[in-house]
Design a protein with these regions (language model features):
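Hydrophobic alpha-helical segments and their helix-loop junctions in multi-pass secondary transporters
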Residues: 160-200, 208, 218-227, 411-428
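Transmembrane-helix boundary/entry motifs in multi-pass membrane transporters
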Residues: 10-12, 47, 74-103, 123-128, ...
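Extracellular loop-to-transmembrane helix junctions
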Residues: 14, 41-66, 83-84, 89-93, ...
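C-terminal membrane-solvent junction of multi-pass transporters and transport-like membrane proteins
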Residues: 157, 352, 362-374, 398-449
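Loop-to-transmembrane helix boundary motifs in multi-pass membrane proteins
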Residues: 128-134, 322, 354-389, 442-446
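Flexible loop linkers connecting adjacent transmembrane helices
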Residues: 2-5, 38-41, 66-90, 118-120, ...
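Hydrophobic transmembrane alpha-helices that form the core helical bundles
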Residues: 92-124, 335-355
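Juxtamembrane transmembrane-helix boundary signature
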Residues: 26, 53-86, 97-103, 108, ...
Length: 449
């Protein structure tokens, strides 16, 4: 059970910078193929006129992740344990998550591994296949340790590479402030004739909606942020203690002073999650500017990994090979960061789901073994079945995406509202509950999300 320790005094002022970190892992994970490929392609087709889509998509998901982390700070348990407390039949919400996320985790890593292999092979003299194995084995080893600080160090380094690589290109091809600022005004530009001739649909929403949906990741990314908050030891969470529900007896014993400390930690979560939204927005906009400044003038709208590869080639021809190399390096870092996040996050998520839904599993294995069993399974299922044998279970991929976008994410926002405003207040004494109850702003943001 957690927490069974005293609540640390939260840092204030500039000292808060010393404990920021979950946001780095969160941002590095969710900046993946959607940002590298979709944002660049949309920039090629629409220019910078739809930057508002990036901001909207990331902001709505940010609100879900930040609000879920607020619950974790105040209780010490992750988002999946919160879902187990939903009113109704026992663990019904967790069963939904277990089925849907098991499908996604079993096959999704393989597609990122494929894209990563293509990127790495453009930087090093290795084949696409070998490149995919290299980056995925690296991500597997980072995740295997199971400790937050190691993941944080690796992700921080990858974020720095992303910033350097993407901004180098974006600054050189920057469209000017007037055109740039127009991109923040909601508008739907028409598909240009040259793009229609290349097979792009005449319905702009077919290009825009995937970008909107992938902004800041999917359902799992927001759950994982609560794990990174636990890893950092914010508030009531015990550092790197996973796989345990909140200690209800201890929560009932919280004093007024401890509740005020938790409010301080909640503010740190607001600051930390804001770092994630700023990083994600700036880097994704950087990819869009690169597409608008390099591919659009050449009237090119490639798809898949070819978007970044062709952009790098064209940039190298015009402005030198250093920028083209850095752009590919930034794209590779983004995909590797996503792999690390997925292989560190999904095993935690599924281990929690199985622990709650099948208690015998938790009695038989300690948390680290549970985590590593799922990690090994997802590594093998993706790399052998999906990646090496080139099997793409299209129906499962589409089903996973459909469940995530149309079912899980709206339910996630609803469940967090219930968790914050109905479940959490019952865990404390009335005077403590009154202090920790979130204001109406969080609820409004979740309803919009």
């Amino acid at each position: 059970m957690v927490p069974s320790h005293s609540i640390k005094t939260p840092l204030t002022g500039l000292a808060i910078l010393a404990v920021l970190g979950p946001s780095i892992v969160w941002a590095s994970e969710y900046i993946g193929s959607g940002e590298v490929i979709l944002a660049t392609r949309n920039g090629a087709i629409f220019g910078t006129g739809i930057m508002w889509v990036i901001i909207s998509g990331i902001f709505l998901k940010f609100w879900i992740g930040m609000s879920g982390a607020r619950y974790t700070v105040c209780t010490g348990e992750g988002m999946i344990d919160m879902f187990a407390r939903m009113p109704g039949p026992k663990n019904w919400a967790v069963w939904i998550v277990l089925v849907a996320q098991f499908i996604s985790a079993t096959i999704a890593v393989g597609s990122i591994a494929t894209a990563s292999g293509v990127f790495l092979s453009s930087l090093l003299p290795v084949s696409h296949s070998i490149g995919g194995w290299i980056v995925t084995v690296f991500a597997f080893l980072v995740a295997w340790v199971g400790r937050f600080n190691w993941v944080k160090v690796v992700m921080s380094f990858l974020v720095l590479i992303m910033i350097l690589g993407v901004f180098w290109v974006a600054v050189i091809v920057f469209p000017g402030w007037s055109e740039f600022l127009r991109g923040f005004i909601p508008q739907i530009p028409a598909i240009p004739d040259w793009a229609l001739a290349q097979g792009v649909s005449d319905n702009p929403w077919k290009e825009i909606l995937p970008l909107l949906g992938w902004g800041a990741g999917g359902f799992a990314s927001q759950v994982w942020y609560s794990y990174w908050v636990i890893g950092a030891g914010y508030g009531a969470a015990r550092k790197d203690v996973y796989g345990k529900p909140a200690d209800i007896v201890r929560l009932k014993e919280f004093t007024i002073d401890e509740a005020k400390k938790l409010l301080g930690w909640s503010r740190i979560v607001y600051y930390d999650s804001s770092v994630a939204i700023v990083l994600g927005t700036l880097i994704t906009i950087g990819f869009m500017i690169a597409g608008a400044g390099v591919l659009r003038p050449e009237q090119l709208a490639p798809s898949g990994e070819h978007v970044a590869l062709q952009l790098s080639e064209l940039f190298s021809l015009r402005w030198g090979s250093a920028g083209g190399f850095l752009f590919l390096l930034g794209g590779t870092a983004a995909l590797v960061g996503t792999l690390v996040g997925q292989l560190a996050g999904w095993p935690r998520l599924l281990a929690d789901c199985v622990r709650i839904c099948i208690p015998a599993f938790n009695r038989k294995f300690k948390w680290l073994m549970q985590f590593r069993l799922f990690l090994a399974f997802f590594f093998l299922s993706n790399m052998i079945i999906v990646y090496s044998f080139n099997l793409r279970p299209v129906k499962l991929v589409k089903l996973g995406a459909l469940l995530d976008g149309l079912l899980l994410t709206p339910l996630q926002a609803l469940w967090i509202v219930i968790g914050l405003y109905i479940v959490m207040p019952r865990l404390y004494r009335p005077e403590v509950s009154k202090i920790l109850r979130p204001n109406w702003v969080l609820g409004t943001g979740l309803i919009i999300a």
